Curated annotation (Swiss-Prot):
GO MF, one annotated term: protein-macromolecule adaptor activity
NCBIfam families (alphabetical): PRK02315.1-4
Annotated gene: mecA
Organism name: Streptococcus pneumoniae serotype 2 (strain D39 / NCTC 7466)
UniProt xrefs under InterPro entries: MecA_C_sf, Neg-reg_MecA
Protein name: Adapter protein MecA
UniProt family annotation: Belongs to the MecA family.
Self-association and partners: Homodimer.
Biological role stated in the UniProt entry: Enables the recognition and targeting of unfolded and aggregated proteins to the ClpC protease or to other proteins involved in proteolysis.
Amino acid sequence: MKMKQISDTTLKITISLEDLMDRGMEIADFLVPQEKTEEFFYAILDELEMPDSFLDTGMLSFRVTPKPDKVDVFVTKSKIDQNLDFEDLSDLPDMEELAQMSPDEFIKTLEKSIADKTKDDIEAIQSLEQVEAKEEEQEQAEQEAESKKEPYIYYILSFAKLADLVAFAKTVTFEMETSELYKMNERYYLTILVDIENHPSPYPAWLLARMREFADDSDISRSVLQEYGQVLMSHDAVLNLQKIG
């Protein structure tokens, strides 16, 4: 379970299904407002240590968005009082004016006063809906980017001397699918294909930094090497170079 402050008036709390079960809750509990749900909301706010700006601010509005593996709860500060009191409706006429009103005029005046009082609350809800829509778009974009991520990366390294190439090959201990060796314009080029699918996202950059300790990263693509370079080893180049000397 984690909390993120989106703005001065809005918090986003993400609750996993496991967290829900640990607290005796399930998604169906959020479909119909009930005392159990409200108690749960305030309990998790206490547990997550709500920011000071949200303390003692009166009523809070909760908006729940169920997901397949979690529940997102958006919490917004509300300016409306939980119990509306006629004394709070300062725009209402005094008793003498009220006595002269028809029932229709009284109802319209009362509705206007309540509408003015709840305007801030309505705006907060509308703002919350906009925040939720942006969060949805961001999550969808991240999921699409993740799905498009290639599971393999070709690293292409450049060496001025064959001895440097052999020395580098002997330092390689990471797993690779295959490797190739080309020669072009009096330089040696080593391509290394690595499966990154089951590695953390920083792994490709970490691996490249490690390679750069012994070799130069190249701007030349594999397709250029295939077309214009001389193929010295078409597969398992690193393994074969490790056998030298």
